[in-house]
């Protein structure tokens, strides 16, 4: 018994900031950003537009795409590291926005790997038989964590949300398998300078870029190869590779090492920047909207985030 995706949705704030616009108040330029990240623009939420608002927009799209009612949802999981409030959770606020009754809702925090983590958790809960229809969301307002004087980080992130509706599969479609990992020893590679119990602030993003690049390649490659081997899949059997959209150099290097053909690699980082837990569901929503995915296609997700946390998932559409 496994879960399958029956609907997708994605939302990006209307405000777009290009590299050239960013260079007006950050010591950088378009060539420098593109060369190092592949990013040309990012979407930035307004001050009064919160993570829960982004989540709601994407959730409404996913519900419509799945052709179900919001009242059919019996569990909400929101993957985010940028909650509106310390409490309650974004998922619970979304529960209220959707006007739902007493179904459970909670947030899951695994940063950029959040959606892959959430997918495994949701699959386990559906397999338990307790839940039939789960709304799984990746939503982030990453720009709220940026130090706009640090050009090594502030140019890399954007805001957005992506959602999927999951139900139990009655055929061979759905989640084939997934794996998730963490390494707390690598905490200082990517973290924020603050937190509620530390200093009562959200802090700003601090990143050791070169170390993170090496770990991303090594850990995502190993995760993918282990997943394919365990499930007796070959790389040639993958129809679409949807990696976390952090950096075009990481995406391209992974595809090269894994020998995944260029036309199979989904890339949205140029226009979306790094939307953390939202990046994979946003990319999936973009791919589905293009009409390219067909029934039976094999999709491969993989992500790495702060913690470090990482993992991969195989899905038959």
Curated annotation (Swiss-Prot):
Statement: the UniProt record of this protein carries the keyword Cytoplasm: yes
Active-site positions on this chain: 112, 244, 274
Record-level GO cellular component terms: cytoplasm
Uppermost EC category: transferase
Xref: Gene3D superfamilies: 3.40.47.10
Keyword Signal: no
EC identifiers of the protein: 2.3.1.180
Pfam short name (any one): ACP_syn_III_C
Origin: domain of life: Bacteria
TM annotation in the entry: none
Reactions performed catalytically: malonyl-[ACP] + acetyl-CoA + H(+) = 3-oxobutanoyl-[ACP] + CO2 + CoA
Database matches in PANTHER family: 3-OXOACYL-[ACYL-CARRIER-PROTEIN] SYNTHASE, BETA-KETOACYL-[ACYL-CARRIER-PROTEIN] SYNTHASE III, CHLOROPLASTIC
Domain characteristics, as noted in the entry: The last Arg residue of the ACP-binding site is essential for the weak association between ACP/AcpP and FabH.
UniProt function note: Catalyzes the condensation reaction of fatty acid synthesis by the addition to an acyl acceptor of two carbons from malonyl-ACP. Catalyzes the first condensation reaction which initiates fatty acid synthesis and may therefore play a role in governing the total rate of fatty acid production. Possesses both acetoacetyl-ACP synthase and acetyl transacylase activities. Its substrate specificity determines the biosynthesis of branched-chain and/or straight-chain of fatty acids.
Family: Belongs to the thiolase-like superfamily. FabH family.
Name of the protein described by the UniProt record: Beta-ketoacyl-[acyl-carrier-protein] synthase III
Organism: Rickettsia akari (strain Hartford)
